[in-house]
């Protein structure tokens, strides 16, 4: 999550410093891909425009739920993808908190990646969408992969792998005999 937030904020800082104000043509990269500065007070695809504080509070709630849920995930790929989604949501939340706007949590999110056939977006938006879709695919089609850490017993102690009998574990373990 920290890497996503850092990259998101660095790219947004670059966009604000280097790109012309909203309404200019921007920088053409290739095909329909442009860098063009835009400020979004709503959510992805400009939904909820003018509802910055509500969007920010929803983001805080989603981040909190994802952090809470991540405690029960035992698959490294799932943890990484949840971290990517949390990083994206946190990156956009940082904009709402620290960029001038319309009062409490009313800052605008910096968007700058423009495709002529798609709404303008940023790295955080990409992390949320791509991470969320990848997480949904993994949760749907692949079983949990353990992180390598032993599961905890109800007492909080790591459980031993395999059955134990008389203090010896594994196949051919000693048994109590009369």
Regions found by a protein language model. Name each.
Residues 1-178:
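Alpha-helical transmembrane bundles and membrane-interface segments of multipass inner-membrane proteins
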């Amino acid at each position: 999550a920290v890497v996503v937030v850092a990259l998101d904020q660095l790219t947004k800082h670059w966009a604000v410093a280097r790109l012309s104000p909203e309404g200019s043509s921007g920088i053409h990269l290739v095909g329909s891909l442009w860098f063009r500065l835009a400020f979004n007070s709503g959510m992805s695809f400009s939904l909820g425009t003018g509802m910055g504080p509500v969007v920010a509070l929803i983001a805080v709630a989603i981040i909190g739920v994802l952090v809470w849920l991540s405690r029960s995930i035992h698959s490294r790929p799932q943890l990484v993808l949840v971290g990517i989604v949390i990083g994206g949501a946190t990156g956009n939340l940082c904009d709402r908190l620290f960029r001038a706007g319309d009062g409490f949590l009313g800052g605008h999110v910096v968007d700058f990646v423009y495709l002529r056939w798609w709404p303008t977006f940023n790295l955080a938006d990409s992390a949320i969408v791509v991470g969320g879709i990848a997480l949904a695919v993994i949760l749907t089609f692949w079983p949990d992969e353990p992180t390598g850490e032993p599961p905890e017993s109800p007492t909080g102690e790591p459980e031993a792998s395999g059955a134990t009998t008389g203090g010896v574990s594994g196949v051919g373990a000693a048994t109590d005999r009369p």
